[in-house]
Structures are given as C-alpha cells and as structure tokens.
C-alpha cells in the first residue's frame, strides 16, 4: 500500500511544472514567510510516529523567537476548542489564541503577530478591544484572523451552536461582524444594526495605533467573496506532495474575486516542510509518519467534514479530510533535501497572486532552525533579507 501511494505521489511530482528563474524575476519573487505555531498538541501530524508534545507558552515562545531571528515575517495561531481524539488525542489539548499571542507579542520586537477569533464565541466589540490591547503590547504588530467555525461539536458542547442553517449563513454573520470591528477600530464608536448584531452607541477606546489587519481563510466561493471585500490577505491550502504550484487555481480564483471589488488581496499558502540532507532521507521521514497515521482521529475528522451539507464541495474542511494526505490534514507538503525545498518554495513565489506562505514543520524548533540556516539562504524569493547575526536564536 505504501509503495503504490509513493508512486502516486511521484506521478504528482513529475506532472507538476518546473519553473526556471532569472535575475529579473528576483524582485517579483519576494515572498513573505510565516509560522503556524502549534497551539494544539502534536502540531499538524496526526500520527503515532510523529513527535508527541503538549502545547505550552514556553514552546511557542521559543518557536516564535527563533522565527523572528531567522527573519520570518509573521506568526499565526489558530483556535481549536475540541480535538479529534484517537490514540494521539489529536488537538484535545489547546491553548487560547488571543492570550497566547499577547504573551508572544511581549517577548518579540519585529515579527507580525496574528491571533484567531472564533467569532461564534466572542462578541465583535470584545475582539475589537482585545485587539487594540495587543496592538499596544506589540507596538502595532498585531492582526486578527477571523473564522466562522466549521466543527459543530466545538460549539454544541457550550450550548452556542446556532443550528445547521448557520453553515449557509456563516459569511453573512461574518460580514456583519467585521463591519462592527471596522467601526470600532476606525472611530471608536458603532451604531451598526443588522440581522446578527445590534450596536447602541458601542464604544472602544483607545483605537489601534495602526490600521488593524484582518485575514481570513476562505476557499469556498462565499469565503473568497468575503476576503475580497474585507480581508487584507487570504489563506489557502497547498495541495499534494511536492506539487508546489498545484494551488494556483485557488490563488487565481482569489485574485479574480478581489479584482471584482477593486482591491488587492493576495493568497498566503499553507505548507508543511519535511526536509533533510537528501531527498531520500526526507522521504523516509514522511513515509514513517504516514505509517503511524492515527486512524481513529482521522475517522473523526472525516465524520465532521460530512456534516456541512450546505457550503458546497470546496471548503477547507473537505480538503482536510481527503484521504490523499490526511495524516497532515492535506496541507501542501514539501518533502526533500534543503535545496529541493528551497526550489519548490521559489516555485510557489512565482504563482500569480501568491504573496506568502504559512509553514508548519514536523519538528518545529529544529525545523525552523534548519529552514533559516539551510533552506532560506538558497531561496531567490528571500534573497532580499539582511545577513543573520551570529547570535543563537
């Protein structure tokens, strides 16, 4: 079974176009890099063979400080309120996003910090005030990722699931939510009246010191339409294993949606990096992780993905549950030597509409260090960076 799956991945890799670059491409290829911090246990590998660890502030502090040392542009944390179970208890143990990122804002100085708001759990006026507070802590380096919520048990357990019709109305809800945020961040006052929210001389002060960035991760048509109108950039999943440009149609859809609103909303693409000295050594690690897939946790994810029957077939959760590479929730996976991974990331940068990547690693601390020391120096799209100091991250 593993042999046939490997062959399928090789076919995908061989079919992917290989791009060549010239010096004149270098400026156009400048691409931002972020780290998707492991706010939940075990990061993004649903495998008994992957590193097993609990999320702590100290771990995430070490990760983000190391990322800042290696000139990463931003750090993002998700929010997860209930996990997948299984042998690995995958994502059963999670920190909270805003409080974690407030702490990380206080121990960093340059890197942009993003927290995720589960908008069903927090009124927009509270998020507006929390964001303004972290803006003050960070010196203007904070932004907010807005999510509508797809995993019904996260909200049912608290008695706040609004009913299954929410699946088809969630971006209507989010549209009102962000309008309240923009009112409060812009003028400090909101009298917004809508179907979901009613503000009556609602006040928030002080306002953020800089315009607050809002990001989203919409891949459905409704999600992209929302991002086109309100987001500063939009996250999307990479696709496949060693097929770095396979997400290009998604980026093109986002670009087209943004053009219809007269805005520029770039795509930031999610990838996992599994690197080693040679392609074969990296591939061996990937095969080892797949062999230990936590089938019980993966079955739970598949079950949850089938509960939303109203949002279409192009949602994030349906890609996460696809059996092709479910062991890491089907984010794009780059497996190879340091040079191979650098080349593939340069290919990502050459896709129209792609402005950045959000990276995860099989082992975050060693992975970020290896990326900073061995991969990033080989990337054309990061050639603009200053030389590293000799300080240990």
Curated annotation (Swiss-Prot):
Any one Gene Ontology MF annotation carried by this entry is: uracil oxygenase activity
Gene3D superfamilies assigned to the protein according to its UniProt record, in alphabetical order:
Luciferase-like domain
A UniProt-annotated Pfam family: Bac_luciferase
Instruction: Explain what induces or represses this protein's expression.
Output: Up-regulated by the nitrogen regulatory protein C (NtrC also called GlnG) and repressed by RutR.
What Enzyme Commission number(s) apply to this enzyme? 1.14.99.46
Q: What does the record give as the reaction this protein catalyses?
A: uracil + FMNH2 + NADH + O2 = (Z)-3-ureidoacrylate + FMN + NAD(+) + H2O + H(+); thymine + FMNH2 + NADH + O2 = (Z)-2-methylureidoacrylate + FMN + NAD(+) + H2O + H(+)
Name a biological process GO annotation.
nitrogen utilization
Keyword annotations of the record: Flavoprotein, FMN, Monooxygenase, NADP, Oxidoreductase
> Where on this chain does FMN bind?
79-80, 145, 154, 170-171, 220
Stored NCBIfam families: RutA
Instruction: Write out the function statement from the record.
Output: The FMN-N(5)-oxide reacts spontaneously with NADH to produce FMN. Requires the flavin reductase RutF to regenerate FMN in vivo.
Name the protein family.
Belongs to the NtaA/SnaA/DszA monooxygenase family. RutA subfamily.
Query: What protein is this chain from?
Result: Pyrimidine monooxygenase RutA
Query: What is the native source organism of this protein?
Result: Escherichia coli O6:H1 (strain CFT073 / ATCC 700928 / UPEC)
């Amino acid at each position: 079974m593993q042999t046939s799956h490997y062959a399928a991945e090789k076919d995908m890799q061989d079919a992917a176009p290989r791009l060549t670059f010239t010096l004149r491409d270098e400026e156009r290829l400048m691409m931002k890099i972020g780290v998707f911090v492991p706010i939940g246990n075990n990061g993004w590998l649903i495998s008994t063979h992957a590193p097993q660890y609990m999320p702590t502030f100290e771990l995430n502090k070490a990760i983000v400080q190391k990322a800042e040392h290696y000139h990463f542009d931003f750090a993002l944390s998700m929010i997860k309120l209930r996990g997948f179970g299984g042998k690995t208890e995958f994502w059963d143990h999670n920190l909270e996003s805003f409080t974690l990122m407030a702490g990380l804002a206080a121990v960093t100085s340059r890197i942009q910090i993003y927290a995720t708001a589960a908008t069903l759990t927090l009124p927009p006026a509270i998020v507006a005030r929390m964001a303004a507070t972290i803006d003050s802590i960070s010196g203007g380096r904070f932004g907010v990722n807005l999510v509508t919520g797809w995993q019904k048990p996260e909200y049912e357990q608290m008695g706040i699931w609004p009913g299954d019709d929410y699946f088809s109305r969630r971006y209507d809800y989010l549209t009102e939510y962000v309008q309240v945020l923009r009112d409060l961040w812009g003028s400090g006052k909101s009298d917004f009246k809508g179907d979901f929210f009613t503000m009556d001389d609602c006040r928030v002060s002080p306002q953020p010191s800089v315009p607050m960035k809002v990001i989203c991760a919409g891949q459905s048509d409704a999600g992209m339409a929302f991002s086109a109108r309100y987001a500063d950039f939009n996250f999307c999943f990479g696709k496949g294993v060693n097929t770095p440009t396979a997400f290009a149609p998604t980026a093109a859809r986002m670009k087209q949606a943004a053009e219809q609103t007269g805005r520029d909303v770039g795509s930031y693409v999610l990838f996992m990096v599994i690197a080693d000295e040679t392609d074969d050594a990296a591939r061996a690690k990937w095969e080892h992780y797949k062999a230990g897939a936590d089938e019980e946790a993966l079955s739970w994810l598949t079950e949850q993905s089938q509960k939303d029957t109203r949002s279409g077939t192009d949602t994030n959760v349906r890609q996460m549950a696809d059996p092709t590479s479910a062991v890491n929730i089907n984010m794009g996976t780059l497996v190879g030597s340091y040079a191979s991974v650098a080349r593939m990331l340069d290919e990502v940068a050459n896709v129209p509409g792609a402005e950045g990547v959000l990276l995860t690693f099989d082992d975050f601390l060693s992975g970020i260090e290896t990326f900073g020391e061995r991969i990033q120096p080989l990337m054309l799209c990061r050639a603009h960076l200053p030389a590293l100091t000799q300080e240990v991250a």
